[in-house]
């Protein structure tokens, strides 16, 4: 039976309450400001032993220094700002990725998510850079699953999918916007749900039962061993809880 793990991107309620409701969370603070090892170890200790953290990678790896979210960082990374972001194969990016992995390991996290912005250049240089980034980062990865959520025009480039396959990087998608993503040799499906609408995100959207039943059907149809269904909208708490209820009612999937 296919296994489905349901959770939220970030904590919509106090951590202690969240631990009693779900078995997984995708940490968001790791994206905005990479936390200390001490913080990560403390959060790991406070969580139940069977609780899982997934980590959204530090923004400096994926977003250029001109990104608005950079301005909110209290501690800017060392080195040349121009060498950060867009998965460039620079020593700065590789170092930031290594630091992200160190934090993720302190959390006991198995999955690390890279999310690049829609402004990422849609050209051959980007493809070469990404290929080199994953090649250079390969030696740093131990047992982690690396996922990449690609946004913008770059999604249409066929060469990109060869890079994913070459480096066994899972393609992270919103299933309401893209189907049959590359799931890696581990056949892992990771979907981040940003709300339904004409754009790439609609965080204010409230998923209806009809939407959630459609999501259930998509999960029945998709080929995978394990799926992570991570809600990333304003009403993610209620939507995630309701989706889990629907899966239990319909059966056919192992729900966590």
Describe the residue ranges of each PLM region.
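Residues lining hydrophobic/aromatic ligand-binding pockets adjacent to catalytic sites
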Residues: 1-256
């Amino acid at each position: 039976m296919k296994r489905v793990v349901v959770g939220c991107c970030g904590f919509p309620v106090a951590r202690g309450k969240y631990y009693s409701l779900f078995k997984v969370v995708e940490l968001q603070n790791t994206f905005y400001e990479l936390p200390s090892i001490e913080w990560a170890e403390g959060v790991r200790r406070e969580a139940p032993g069977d609780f899982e953290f997934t980590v959204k990678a530090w923004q400096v790896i994926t977003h250029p220094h001109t990104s608005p979210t950079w301005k909110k960082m209290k501690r800017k990374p060392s080195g040349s700002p121009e060498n950060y972001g867009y998965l460039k194969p620079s020593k700065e990016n590789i170092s930031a990725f290594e630091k992200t992995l160190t934090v993720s390991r302190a959390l006991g996290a198995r999955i690390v998510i890279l999310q690049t912005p829609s402004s990422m250049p849609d050209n051959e240089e980007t493809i070469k850079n990404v290929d080199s980034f994953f090649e250079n980062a390969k030696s740093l990865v131990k047992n982690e699953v690396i996922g990449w959520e690609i946004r913008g025009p770059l999604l249409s480039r066929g060469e990109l999918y060869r890079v994913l396959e070459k480096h066994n990087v899972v393609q992270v998608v919103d299933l309401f916007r893209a189907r049959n993503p590359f799931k890696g040799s581990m056949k892992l499906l990771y979907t981040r749900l940003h709300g339904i609408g004409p754009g790439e995100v609609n965080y204010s959207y409230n998923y209806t039962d009809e939407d959630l039943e459609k999501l259930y059907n998509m999960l029945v149809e998709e080929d995978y061993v394990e799926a992570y269904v991570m809600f990333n909208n304003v009403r993610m708490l209620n939507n995630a809880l309701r989706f889990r209820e629907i899966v239990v009612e319909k059966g056919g999937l192992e729900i966590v």
